[in-house]
C-alpha cells in the first residue's frame, strides 16, 4: 500500500490541485525553517497561489535578522495572507512539548547541531522534524531495543534448555517459542501487545518426567508415613493385649508367675518392635523413588523360628563340637528335610502350620499380616507359658527361672540350650526352649 507516484505536470482538477498545493506548501515551509534553524543560515521564502478560488494567495517565510521581502513591495504588502518566522515553527509543526526533544537541538532561536549526529546518520533527519516523524523514529528505536532483548532471551533460553534436564529447561523451551511469536508481533508493530503476552503465565506446558517422579515420590513418602502409622497402631494393640494378659495373670497367678509373665511380655514387646523396625528398614530410602531393585523381602519371625529349630536339631546330630552348633557359623549344615522337627512343640497354633519351610520372599503388603499373625502367636505362647509356670510354682514356689543373655558365638550358652532341648517332656524345658528361641530371634534381627 505504497504511495502512488504521480506525473510531474499541471493537475487538471482544481480541487486536487488545491489539496496538493496545501500539502507541498507546508512541507516546503517546514524544510526552509529547518534549514535556517539547523544550519544557522539565512532563508527567505515567498509562495504565491495563482488559483482564482484560493482564499489565501501569498505565503512567505523569513529567517531571523532578515527584512521581509514582500513588505518592501507596497502593492502586495496588505495582501500577504501568512507570514512565517522562526518562532512559529514549534507552534505550527510540533504538537509535543519541548521537554520531549533532545537538548542537543534546542538552543533558543538558533540551535547548534552536534557533529556526532552528522557522523552517525548524515542522511537522516533529526528529531525536530515533527510529531509524526518523531513518533515513527521513537518506535523504530523501541523496536530495535525489543528485538535485541528478545535475541538475548532467545540465546539464554537456548543455553538453559541445553544445559538443564529438569522442568526449567522445558519452561525455557516454551518461552523460546513465545519469543518467536513475539518477534513476529513486533514486525507487525504490536510491541505493547507482545510485551503483555510475555508477562502472561504459560498454561499449556505439559508435565515433564521429573514432575511425574516428584509426584510419585510424594505419594511414596505418604505411603511410608501410612506404614509407620499402621506399625504404631499395631504396637499399641500389642501393648493393650499384653496388658490384658498381665491383668489376667495377676488375678490367677502368684507373685513369681507375675514376674515371669512380665519378662515374657517385655520380650514379646521387644520382638514386635524389632519386627516393625525391620519392616521400615525394608523400605527403599526416602531420598530416592521406589524401584523393583530396591525392594527388600521382609523378615518373618514364624518361619525364622522354624528354620532355627531345624538347623539346631540338625547341628546336634551332625556337629562334633559344641562350638559348631551355631547355625550362623556351622559349615556342615545339612539340607532341609520336611520332618516334625521343623514345627514348634511349645504352642498348639504352631503345630497347625505347614511343616515345610517356604522361600523367604515376601511383598510389602504381607508384612503387616505376618506381624499380626506373629503377635497372635506370641499371645498364645504367653498363655501357654502362664499355665506352665502355674504348674511349676505349685511344685516349687521359690524357684524362678533367670537365664543369662545368649549370643550366637558363646559355646556355653549353646551347650546349655542344647541340654535344655534334649528333654522336651518336662514343662521347664519347654519354657527354656521358648525363651531360647525368642532371644535367638532377637539376635538374628539385630
Swiss-Prot record:
Compositional bias segments (type: Basic and acidic residues): 112-121
Start-end of Polar residues biased regions: 322-355
One Gene Ontology term from the biological process aspect of the record: positive regulation of transcription by RNA polymerase II
InterPro entries associated with the record: TF_MADSbox (IPR002100), TF_MADSbox_sf (IPR036879)
Low complexity bias spans: 143-195, 216-282, 365-432
SUPFAM superfamilies on file: SRF-like
Mitochondrion keyword on record: no
Transmembrane feature ranges: none
Residue ranges, annotated region (Disordered): 95-195, 210-296, 319-432
Chain ranges of the MADS-box domain: 1-61
GO CC aspect terms: nucleus
UniProt subcellular location: Nucleus
Record keywords: DNA-binding, Nucleus, Transcription, Transcription regulation
GO molecular function, one term: RNA polymerase II cis-regulatory region sequence-specific DNA binding
Protein name: Serum factor response D
Organism annotation: Dictyostelium discoideum (Social amoeba)
Gene for this chain: srfD
Amino acid at each position: 500500500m505504497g504511495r502512488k507516484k504521480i506525473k510531474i505536470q499541471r493537475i487538471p482538477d482544481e480541487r486536487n490541485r488545491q489539496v496538493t498545493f496545501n500539502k507541498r506548501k507546508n512541507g516546503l515551509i517546514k524544510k526552509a525553517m529547518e534549514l535556517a534553524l539547523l544550519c544557522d543560515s539565512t532563508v527567505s521564502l515567498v509562495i504565491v497561489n495563482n488559483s482564482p478560488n484560493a482564499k489565501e494567495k501569498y505565503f512567505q517565510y523569513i529567517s531571523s535578522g532578515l527584512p521581509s521581502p514582500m513588505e518592501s513591495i507596497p502593492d502586495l504588502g496588505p495582501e500577504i495572507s501568512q507570514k512565517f518566522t522562526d518562532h512559529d515553527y514549534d507552534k505550527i509543526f510540533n504538537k509535543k512539548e519541548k521537554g520531549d526533544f533532545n537538548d542537543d537541538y534546542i538552543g533558543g532561536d538558533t540551535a547548534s547541531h552536534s557533529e556526532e549526529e552528522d557522523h552517525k546518520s548524515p542522511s537522516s533527519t533529526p528529531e525536530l522534524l515533527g510529531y509524526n516523524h518523531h513518533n515513527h523514529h521513537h518506535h523504530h528505536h523501541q523496536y530495535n531495543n525489543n528485538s535485541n532483548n528478545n535475541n538475548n532471551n532467545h540465546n539464554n533460553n537456548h543455553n538453559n534448555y541445553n544445559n538443564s534436564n529438569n522442568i526449567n529447561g522445558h519452561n525455557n523451551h516454551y518461552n523460546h517459542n513465545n519469543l518467536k511469536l513475539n518477534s513476529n508481533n513486533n514486525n507487525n508493530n504490536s510491541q505493547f501487545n507482545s510485551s503483555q503476552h510475555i508477562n502472561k503465565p504459560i498454561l499449556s506446558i505439559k508435565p515433564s518426567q521429573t514432575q511425574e517422579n516428584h509426584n510419585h515420590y510424594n505419594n511414596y513418602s505418604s505411603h511410608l508415613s501410612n506404614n509407620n502409622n499402621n506399625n504404631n497402631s499395631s504396637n499399641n494393640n500389642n501393648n493393650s493385649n499384653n496388658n490384658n494378659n498381665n491383668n489376667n495373670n495377676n488375678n490367677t497367678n502368684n507373685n513369681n508367675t507375675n514376674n515371669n509373665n512380665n519378662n515374657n511380655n517385655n520380650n514379646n514387646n521387644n520382638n514386635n518392635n524389632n519386627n516393625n523396625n525391620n519392616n521400615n528398614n525394608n523400605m527403599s530410602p526416602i531420598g530416592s523413588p521406589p524401584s523393583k531393585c530396591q525392594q527388600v523381602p521382609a523378615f518373618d519371625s514364624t518361619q525364622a523360628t522354624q528354620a532355627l529349630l531345624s538347623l539346631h536339631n540338625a547341628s546336634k546330630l551332625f556337629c562334633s563340637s559344641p562350638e559348631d552348633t551355631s547355625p550362623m557359623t556351622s559349615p556342615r549344615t545339612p539340607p532341609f528335610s520336611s520332618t516334625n522337627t521343623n514345627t514348634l512343640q511349645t504352642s498348639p497354633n504352631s503345630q497347625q502350620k505347614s511343616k515345610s519351610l517356604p522361600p523367604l520372599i515376601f511383598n510389602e503388603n504381607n508384612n503387616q499380616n505376618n506381624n499380626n499373625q506373629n503377635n497372635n502367636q506370641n499371645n498364645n505362647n504367653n498363655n501357654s507359658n502362664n499355665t506352665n509356670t502355674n504348674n511349676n510354682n505349685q511344685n516349687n514356689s521359690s524357684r524362678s527361672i533367670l537365664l543369662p543373655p545368649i549370643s550366637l558365638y558363646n559355646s556355653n550358652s549353646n551347650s546349655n540350650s542344647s541340654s535344655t532341648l534334649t528333654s522336651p517332656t518336662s514343662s521347664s524345658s519347654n519354657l527354656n526352649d521358648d525363651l531360647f528361641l525368642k532371644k535367638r530371634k532377637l539376635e538374628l534381627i539385630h
